[in-house]
C-alpha cells in the first residue's frame, strides 16, 4: 500500500512512497499504468488532461481528431479497444486523393493520378520518378525483419535522406507534392528525415491504405480510449503535476514534482518514463552519455491543425476519401473524420481537419490564432466552395512535437533506449518499429510487463 507523509512546514517537501511511478499520461503511460493496475501505481502528468497527443473534439454525431489522426496496427491498442467495446469505424474502400488544378484524383490509381490530373509532361515525368523510387523500396519494408534483403534495403534507407526521391527531378510541382506529403504524414521536410519512415508512410498510407492493419476511426475519436483508461485509473492519474527530476539508484527512484499544493516527492521501487525525448533528457540529468545521445537523435514533426464541423446535406465529393492532399494551399491535407460513417444513407453534416506540417507549420507558428484560422477557412472554401455558409468556426491546435523521426544514421542509437536504466524503464512510440499510436500502446505495456517481472510476486 502507498504511504503518505503530510508536512505543513513551508520548507519541507511532501513525500509519498509507491511501488511504481509512471511519468506521462499519454497513450504509452496510460497503457503502462493500466497493465500495472493491480499494483501500487501512480501517474504524474504535467498538463491538465490525459491523452498526450491524442486529442478529440466532439459535437453531435461527429468528432474531429485534432491530435493523432487515425488508429492503426495490431497488439495492445487494438486489444484494448475491443476489450472496452469501442466500435471501430472501418476505412475499407476509402482512399487518399490529390487535389490539383480543381480536380480531385485518387492517388491509389496511378493512371488517373498521372493522366487525369492537370499536369504538364514534365510534371508527370517528375512524379513518375518519385513514385518509382518510393514503390521500389516499399515491398522490402513490408517483409519480415529477418529477411536478409529487407535488412539491406532498410539499412540503406536508414542512412540516406528522404529527399533522395527528388534527385534529378526538376518539376516544381513534383517537388512541392513531395514536401506536402512529408509535411502532412510526418510533420517534417524530406531533407530532415532518413528515408525509411518516409518511404513507408508514402508508399503504403498514400497509395494503398488498405494494406495498413486495422486502419480505423474509433467511434468518438481516438480520445475515446484514453478517456476510458484514465477514468479506470481514477485518482491514480494526477494532472497538473509536472516532474522536475527523476533520480535513481539500484534500489529505487526519487521523483520530484509539483502540483497545486506545491513541491512534492515520490519514492518508488520502479519508474516508467513515458514522455517525449527532449522532456526525458530534461528531467533525467543523470542520464549516461549513450542514452543522452540516443534521446538527442530523436526529432519530432510539428503540425498546425484546424478542425471544422460542417453542415452540408447529401453526398459530397470528399465522402469516399479519408484524406485529400492539397499542395499550394495554407494547409497540406484535409482529413475526413466522417469517412467511416459514410455507409448507407448519408447523415447531414461532417467533420474535417486541415493540417499543415514541417516548415509550413513553422511559419504558421509565428502567426496569431485568428490569422491561422482565417487562412485555413478561406482555403477550405477555395477547395470546396460548396461549403460556403456551412462551416462552423475553426478549432485550432498547435503541435510543436508529434511524430518522432530520425536524421540519416540517427536510428542506430535507438537500441540503447530499449534497455532499462536500473529501476527506470522507458516507454514511447519512438521505441518500436514505425512510430504510431499502436507502438506507443505496445511500448507502454511492454515496459509495465518488464517492471512486473522485476518486482516479482507480492
Predicted stretch roles:
Residues 14-15, 239-352, 359-365, 382-383:
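Mid-domain catalytic core of redox enzymes
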Residues 139-253:
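Active-site/ligand-binding neighborhood in enzyme catalytic cores
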Residues 19-43:
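N-terminal Rossmann-like FAD-binding beta1-loop-alpha1 element of flavoenzymes
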Residues 61-140, 151:
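Dinucleotide-binding Rossmann-like beta1-alpha1 core, especially the glycine-rich loop
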Residues 78-100, 172-179, 297-300, 315-318:
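A short alpha-helix-loop-beta-strand transition element characteristic
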Residues 2-15, 31, 252, 318-458:
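Conserved flavin/dinucleotide-binding core of flavoenzymes
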Residues 37-59:
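Glycine-rich FAD pyrophosphate-binding loop
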Amino acid at each position: 500500500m502507498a504511504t503518505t507523509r503530510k508536512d505543513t512546514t513551508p520548507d519541507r517537501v511532501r513525500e509519498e512512497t509507491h511501488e511504481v511511478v509512471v511519468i506521462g499520461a499519454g497513450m504509452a503511460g496510460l497503457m503502462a499504468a493500466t497493465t500495472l493496475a493491480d499494483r501500487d501505481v501512480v501517474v504524474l502528468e504535467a498538463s491538465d488532461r490525459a491523452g498526450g497527443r491524442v486529442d478529440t473534439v466532439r459535437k453531435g454525431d461527429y468528432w474531429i481528431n485534432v491530435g493523432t489522426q487515425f488508429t492503426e496496427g495490431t497488439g495492445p491498442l487494438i486489444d484494448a479497444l475491443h476489450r472496452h467495446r469501442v466500435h471501430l469505424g472501418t476505412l475499407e474502400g476509402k482512399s487518399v486523393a490529390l487535389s490539383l488544378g480543381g480536380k480531385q484524383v485518387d492517388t491509389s490509381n496511378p493512371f488517373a493520378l498521372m493522366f487525369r490530373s492537370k499536369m504538364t509532361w514534365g510534371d508527370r515525368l517528375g512524379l513518375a520518378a518519385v513514385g518509382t523510387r518510393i514503390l521500389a523500396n516499399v515491398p522490402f519494408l513490408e517483409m519480415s525483419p529477418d529477411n536478409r534483403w529487407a535488412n539491406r534495403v532498410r539499412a540503406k534507407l536508414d542512412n540516406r535522406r528522404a529527399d533522395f526521391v527528388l534527385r534529378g527531378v526538376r518539376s516544381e510541382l513534383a517537388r512541392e507534392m513531395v514536401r506536402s506529403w512529408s509535411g502532412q504524414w510526418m510533420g517534417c521536410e524530406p531533407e530532415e528525415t532518413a528515408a525509411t519512415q518516409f518511404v513507408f508512410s508514402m508508399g503504403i498510407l498514400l497509395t494503398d491504405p488498405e494494406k495498413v492493419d486495422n486502419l480505423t476511426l474509433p467511434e468518438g475519436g481516438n480520445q475515446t480510449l484514453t478517456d476510458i483508461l484514465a477514468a479506470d485509473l481514477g485518482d491514480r492519474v494526477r494532472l497538473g503535476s509536472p516532474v522536475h527530476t527523476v533520480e535513481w539508484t539500484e534500489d529505487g527512484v526519487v521523483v520530484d514534482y509539483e502540483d497545486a499544493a506545491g513541491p512534492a516527492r515520490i519514492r518508488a521501487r520502479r519508474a516508467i518514463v513515458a514522455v517525449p525525448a527532449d522532456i526525458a533528457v530534461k528531467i533525467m540529468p543523470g542520464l549516461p552519455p549513450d542514452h543522452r545521445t540516443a534521446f538527442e537523435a530523436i526529432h519530432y514533426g510539428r503540425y498546425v491543425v484546424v478542425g471544422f464541423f460542417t453542415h452540408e446535406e447529401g453526398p459530397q465529393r470528399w465522402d469516399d476519401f479519408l484524406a485529400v492532399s492539397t499542395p499550394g494551399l495554407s494547409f497540406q491535407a484535409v482529413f475526413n473524420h466522417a469517412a467511416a460513417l459514410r455507409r448507407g444513407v448519408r447523415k447531414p453534416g461532417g467533420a474535417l481537419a486541415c493540417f499543415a506540417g514541417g516548415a509550413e507549420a513553422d511559419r504558421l507558428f509565428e502567426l496569431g490564432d485568428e490569422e491561422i484560422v482565417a487562412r485555413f477557412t478561406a482555403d477550405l472554401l477555395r477547395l470546396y466552395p460548396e461549403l460556403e455558409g456551412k462551416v462552423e468556426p475553426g478549432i485550432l491546435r498547435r503541435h510543436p512535437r508529434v511524430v518522432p523521426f530520425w536524421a540519416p544514421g540517427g536510428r542506430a542509437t535507438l537500441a540503447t533506449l530499449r534497455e532499462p536504466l536500473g529501476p527506470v524503464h522507458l516507454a514511447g512510440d519512438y521505441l518500436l518499429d514505425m512510430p504510431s499510436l499502436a507502438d506507443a500502446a505496445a511500448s507502454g505495456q511492454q515496459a509495465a510487463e518488464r517492471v512486473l517481472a522485476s518486482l516479482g510476486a507480492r
